[in-house]
């Protein structure tokens, strides 16, 4: 299982990489724009924040296959082993095929249906990213889409992995993992929720109180 953070916040990645067993960091154009740092600045910073380990993902901006390939080459000039995110449009599928031929790893993104995701994997994408919460918001079932996609990839494109994205709650992420999803990327707020349980803090405080009452100290 691979756990990613979906952010361009270098400070947060530095802090959470000490805690979480991170496989890397994913970004998209909206995330990069919100951080107001250009790719050539923030991508090396994110790489350094992870101690030079883990995989980075960044997305193309062009809308034609040829333009996407050119964008991918630019991204690889910034971080040599970056995984290039390509929206799974008709042009995106063509770009994924071209990038596969060049040996550039890709992730098929903006996936709203299992068939769409399967096509990106068959075209050569190493990862496929269904938008779980956005599918729910449009009246679909994000978890069912992940389940269907996972089964399709197992049967027809076993070299590809589902990398589920677009979460609003930890429960959505856990349901994806229970459906067999091999990798997930969490926004910072959901990642923080996964390690923030008031009952745990209360339990630790009670342990300290009892120990202090018995031994006059809080150390062993």
From Swiss-Prot:
Keywords: Carbohydrate metabolism, Cytoplasm, Lyase, Schiff base. GO terms for molecular function: fructose 6-phosphate aldolase activity. SUPFAM superfamilies: Aldolase. Its EC number is 4.1.2.-. It catalyses: beta-D-fructose 6-phosphate = dihydroxyacetone + D-glyceraldehyde 3-phosphate. InterPro entries: Aldolase_TIM, F6P_aldolase, TAL/FSA, Transaldolase_3B/F6P_aldolase, Transaldolase_AS, TSA/FSA_arc/bac. The active site is at residue 85. PROSITE patterns: TRANSALDOLASE_1, TRANSALDOLASE_2. It comes from the Bacteria. Pfam families: TAL_FSA. It is found in: Cytoplasm. GO terms for cellular component: cytoplasm. One of its GO terms (biological process) is fructose metabolic process. The keyword Signal does not apply. Catalyzes the reversible formation of fructose 6-phosphate from dihydroxyacetone and D-glyceraldehyde 3-phosphate via an aldolization reaction. Homodecamer. Belongs to the transaldolase family. Type 3A subfamily. This is Fructose-6-phosphate aldolase 1. It comes from Escherichia coli O6:H1 (strain CFT073 / ATCC 700928 / UPEC). The lineage of its organism: Bacteria, Pseudomonadati, Pseudomonadota, Gammaproteobacteria, Enterobacterales. The gene is fsaA.
